[in-house]
Amino acid sequence: MAAPPSPGRTADQADQVCTFLFKKPGRKGAAGLRKRPACDPEHGESSSSGDEGDTVAQPPRVAPRPRGLHSWQKAAHGDRRGEEAAPESLDVVYRSTRSAKPVGPEDMGATADFEQDTEKEHHTPTILKCSQRVQEALRGREHDHIYRGIHSYLRYLKPKDTSMGNSSSGMARKGPIRAPGHLRATVRWDYQPDICKDYKETGFCGFGDSCKFLHDRSDYKLGWEIERELEEGRYCICEDENHEVGSEEEEIPFRCFICRQAFQNPVVTKCRHYFCESCALEHFRATPRCYICDQPTGGIFNPAKELMAKLQKLQAAEGKKR
């Protein structure tokens, strides 16, 4: 239901809607610009020339170019100009020698001198030798009053116990000794692995896994030994040498660590180290500690039954092979 019109107003005035006008904000910088006055078509050129001083002329706007493209075009034009300006006489052409030998000395610079060293004519030992020759030539003669340089003054007394007096021996030299100019050596490298000596001889190493040497009981031959066998025709003929050692055999020490001989009545300590009975008792008289790990044994040496059984098994296997 519509509300009744207020008293004192007509129906047409009540239906009218009030509108609000908002002022648009002006552009920044527009306040400092002058407006160009409107010119009449009748005045023509006179009015335009008269108002020329009051108007502000704006330069035409140029679209900016990308910096990379601009620099690339400049560099390309610069290269083209350089190519056009370069004369044809700068072209380098190499003619083939039709030879397989390298260009240069045949010894490939092996007899070349070191350019940073002093020249041999001005080297201190050379000057000393020249001075000695002059002194020997003038010895016993009268002075001829000829100047031969600062190093060739006549000496009436023969120097002794000095670098000049002992220089003939070759052990004492005056000034720095010149290194040999030409030196060529032929070196041959051969591979020889570092094998743990204790493990190879006894089958046990006190360092264990921390040992930096190779734990292997195999026999190694050097390169010259293999070449000699190849020349004599004895290489890989003996089949007994081509065998592999099992992992079970590697854990068995096959020799005493004290005497480095085969076990005689082997005994074992509390720290699980194996020795001959006589070697263990003799060492116990000197010290009650273990020979390998230096732990106290307490005088307890048990018979190594496991070791004896394994050694007998190995001996039986070797007897069958024979």
UniProtKB/Swiss-Prot annotation:
UniProt zinc finger (RING-type) residues: 256-294
Start-end of Low complexity biased regions: 46-60
ZnF (C3H1-type) ranges: 190-218
CDD domains per the UniProt record, alphabetical: RING-HC_RNF113A_B
Gene: RNF113B
Chain intervals for the UniProt region annotation (Disordered): 24-92
SMART domains (alphabetical): RING, ZnF_C3H1
Taxonomic superkingdom: Eukaryota
One cellular-component annotation, GO: U2-type spliceosomal complex
Record Pfam families: zf-C3HC4_3, zf-CCCH
GO MF assignments: zinc ion binding
GO biological process: snoRNA splicing
Protein name: RING finger protein 113B
Keyword terms, alphabetized: Metal-binding, Zinc, Zinc-finger
Disulphide bond pairs: none
